[in-house]
A protein has these predicted regions:
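Short S/T/G/P-rich N-terminal loop/turn motif that feeds into the first structured element of a domain
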Residues: 2-85, 89-108
């Protein structure tokens, strides 16, 4: 079972926590349908926002970049048996997870 997201401590400076997932899917439209159906559980687990990208020469190679309330919440979610089953049903092949702390952001 996926537990509710972790909240930053009151008064603590919020730093952005991100997860970068790179994976191949069997069929993008089928994967996207499962991804969209999981929106509520992703939000409940602590995902704040996301961005989906694909390789310019391979429509089934997906990059999922997301912001989380905490990396602990993200790890708990992505390692949960429930999500392993969702990935299997969605046709995900060998996902690579990169957990990231934001250190700087700027506009040019």
């Amino acid at each position: 079972m996926i537990t509710p997201r972790h909240q930053p401590q009151r008064g603590a400076k919020a730093t952005m926590q991100h997860v970068l997932i790179i994976h191949e899917v069997e069929d993008y439209p089928a994967w996207k349908a499962v991804f969209d159906q999981a929106a509520a559980i992703r939000k409940h687990a602590g995902e704040i926002r996301y961005q989906l990208l694909r390789y310019d020469d391979a429509a089934n190679h997906i990059v999922h970049f997301s912001e989380w309330t905490s990396l602990a919440a993200a790890r708990q979610f992505f390692e949960s048996p429930e999500l392993v089953e969702i990935r299997r049903k969605a046709g995900v092949k060998m996902p690579q997870f990169i957990f990231l702390h934001e250190i700087e952001r700027g506009d040019l």
